Structures are given as structure tokens and as C-alpha cells.
């Protein structure tokens, strides 16, 4: 904890000369931001987002799927989940972060698993919103949809797909520099905005996007990353919180989003970028910790360091771990011999939670900390995480 107090009050991250004032201001700002953030997300959740909560007995698990790492089995699982979610969600597409994760998952589905079908749906989605991000200028949640816009732009090269999200990020980069109010104050934001900036760099060749992303990433990391556990606190209000067993409170889903953001940034970052080794090191540190606390069923509980307190796995976080670990192995960043057994066990665990209709269960609803949910709870962002995981597992199977 001393590391975090020191970082929060570091002269490079604040203007106030008083450490106590700096820390108190940061905690108050973060607490208010959390309240505002959750309030903004508290709108009624439609059936396309939350489709769970039915008794498990009335929803039989799928019997036509296998968790084996073969092309045939991985693609079949991806199709089943993607088809079910697309059929339910397309009439209710949204610009918010929950759907942005789903869209990234649809974009990741390989051609061999009917990827074009889902990309075509994403093109229809983008046209529906005129390729605009969400309404909040500086909020990373409303920028995350830009990942899909930019991935489509790289295939189709229609300027309409690029211009609005580029203008949004240009505007964000012109906001006043308030180092005592980090732009990305919650760890999930590292999935939302950084990949957009990294993709803009790749597309435009303008390094300002990558440099801005790099600066903001390490400001957030210095505040929320625990160098002892190699995990991220959800936000500054969690720095002093503990599980019932005395361990720090580290949220599975939040850390999953961070690891997914890490690999999506690394996918765009040049190998000679000066700070790239820091991202690789952070991925390797987090991967080692995550592998060491994997559950017997291959999955991870909502509170990472007190798994016995949570009866169900949390599959959106678990899927993002599979995605990041598989990407690391596929790209030579993580040792195959060490992590392949972890991935195999985790993928089989995820597939075991797919129901006959195609939904994937055990997904915690919107929140900011470990919470309760049913085995059938299913949300669009969890589906997106599963499809992203499948895309890398399918590569691994090759």
C-alpha cells in the first residue's frame, strides 16, 4: 500500500505540494467519479443485455459442444454463442461499453467460423450510429466502440468510419492536463480507450496517439497496479479494501479487462517503441499471477484472492484471461509450455457454461466489485469476451 500512497502523491502526478491533501483530493475525486459512473450505468437493462436469472433446471446445458482445443470444436462453440447473441442483440444495438465489448468479439470471429456474417452486422451497426462514439466526450466507456469502427475502416477504407472517432480522440487530447484527476481513473478503462488510440496510430502513422496513450496508461498504472500481487485495484476507492480472508480486494472482471487492453495495445505497438518492454513485463507479471490462482474448474472467481467466498466462476473476466494468455502464447510473449495447460483448462471451463440455446452463463452484471448473480446470468460484454477468447484459442489450435 505504501507504493500507492507514494505514487498518488508523486510530484509527477500532482500539483499540490501536500501529500495528505493530494491523497485526500484523489480519494474524494475517485469516490465521486465512481458514484457518477455507476449512476450513469444504472439505466434499465434490456433483455438483450441481461438474459439470465431463469432457473438453471429450465435451461439445459449444451450437449453438442466440446471444450477440446481443435479447430472444429472451437469454431462450433463460437458460432453457437455468436449466433444466439446476434439474433437477440441486433435490434437493440447501443453505443455504450457493454456493447462495445460485444462488437470487438464479433469482429474477432475468424472467417472459418462465419466471421464475415458478424462483420457485416457490425457494418450495419456502425451505419446506424453514423460511426459516432457515445455522447460523453472524455469518458473511455463511450470511446470503446471506436475499436470496431477502426477495425472496419482497415478493411473497407471508408473515411466515414474513421473521421468521427478520430475527431473525438483529438478533442480528448486537447483537454486540460489535470494530473491530479487521471483521465482513466478506473482499471477497466484500460480496455476501453487505449486500443482506440493505438489503432489510430497504426492507421494514421501519427505517433501523437500512441504517445498520449502511453502517458495516460502509466499514470493509471502507477495509481492502481499493485507491484506485490501484480493485480489492479478497480479504482482508488479500493486501495484500502479487503476480502473477508484479509487479502486485498481485486476484482476478477476489472483485471480481465486490463489484460485484454494490454494485448490489444501490444498488437498495434511497434516492436521498437521505447516503453513496449514495460507493457510486456506487465502482461507477464499479471499472467503469472492469474495462472497461479486458477480454479479447479479452470476459471476465476469474482474476488481473485478469496475464491472460496464465491460459489460461481465469473466468465467475462475468465474469458478475457483466456484471450490475453492465448494472445501472449501465440505471439511469443508467454511461454507455451507453461501457459497452454492453463488455457486448455480454462477454455474447457468456459465451454461447460454454454447453454443449449447458445447463451454463456455465469456473467456478473454491471458493477464495480464482486457481487452475486445466477448461473444463467448472461450479458453482452461477457459474450464479447468469450468470442475474443475463442479467436485466440482458435489460432492456438493451429
Predicted segment positions?
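Asp-box/WD-like beta-propeller blade repeats and closely related beta-sheet repeat scaffolds
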Residues: 162-194
Amino acid at each position: 500500500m505504501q507504493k500507492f500512497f507514494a505514487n498518488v502523491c508523486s510530484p509527477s502526478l500532482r500539483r499540490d505540494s501536500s501529500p495528505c491533501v493530494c491523497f485526500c483530493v484523489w480519494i474524494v475525486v475517485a469516490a465521486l467519479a465512481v458514484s457518477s459512473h455507476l449512476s450513469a450505468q444504472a439505466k434499465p437493462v434490456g433483455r438483450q443485455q441481461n438474459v439470465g436469472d431463469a432457473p438453471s433446471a429450465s435451461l439445459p446445458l449444451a450437449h453438442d459442444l466440446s471444450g477440446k482445443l481443435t479447430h472444429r470444436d472451437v469454431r462450433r462453440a463460437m458460432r453457437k454463442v455468436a449466433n444466439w447473441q446476434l439474433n437477440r442483440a441486433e435490434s437493440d444495438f447501443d453505443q455504450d461499453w457493454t456493447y462495445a465489448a460485444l462488437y470487438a468479439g464479433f469482429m474477432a470471429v475468424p472467417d472459418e467460423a462465419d466471421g464475415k456474417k458478424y462483420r457485416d452486422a457490425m457494418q450495419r451497426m456502425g451505419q446506424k450510429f453514423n460511426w459516432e462514439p457515445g455522447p460523453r466526450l472524455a469518458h473511455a466507456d463511450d470511446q470503446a466502440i471506436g475499436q470496431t469502427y477502426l477495425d472496419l475502416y482497415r478493411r473497407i477504407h471508408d473515411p466515414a468510419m474513421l473521421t468521427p472517432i478520430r475527431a473525438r480522440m483529438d478533442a480528448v487530447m486537447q483537454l486540460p492536463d489535470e494530473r491530479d484527476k487521471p483521465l482513466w481513473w478506473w482499471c477497466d478503462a484500460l480496455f476501453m480507450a487505449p486500443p482506440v488510440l493505438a489503432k489510430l496510430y497504426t492507421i494514421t502513422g501519427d505517433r501523437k496517439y500512441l504517445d498520449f496513450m502511453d502517458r495516460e496508461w502509466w499514470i493509471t498504472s502507477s495509481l492502481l497496479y499493485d507491484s506485490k500481487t501484480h493485480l489492479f485495484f478497480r479504482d482508488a476507492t479500493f486501495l484500502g479494501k479487503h476480502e473477508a480472508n484479509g487479502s486485498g480486494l481485486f476484482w476478477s472482471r476489472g483485471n480481465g479487462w486490463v489484460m485484454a487492453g494490454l494485448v490489444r495495445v501490444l498488437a498495434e505497438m511497434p516492436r521498437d517503441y521505447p516503453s513496449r518492454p514495460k507493457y510486456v513485463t506487465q502482461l507477464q507479471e499479471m499472467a503469472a499471477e492469474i495462472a497461479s490462482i486458477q480454479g479447479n474448474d479452470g476459471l476465476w472467481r469474482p474476488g481473485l484472492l478469496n475464491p472460496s467466498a464465491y460459489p460461481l466462476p465469473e466468465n467475462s473476466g475468465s474469458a478475457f484471461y483466456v484471450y490475453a494468455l492465448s494472445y501472449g502464447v501465440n505471439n511469443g510473449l508467454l511461454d507455451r509450455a507453461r501457459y497452454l495447460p492453463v488455457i486448455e483448462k480454462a477454455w474447457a471451463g468456459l465451454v461447460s457454461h454454454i447453454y443449449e440455446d447458445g447463451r454463456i452463463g455465469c456473467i456478473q452484471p454491471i458493477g464495480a466489485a464482486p457481487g452475486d448473480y445466477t448461473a444463467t446470468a448472461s450479458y453482452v460484454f461477457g459474450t464479447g469476451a468469450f468470442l475474443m477468447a475463442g479467436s485466440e484459442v482458435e489460432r492456438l489450435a493451429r
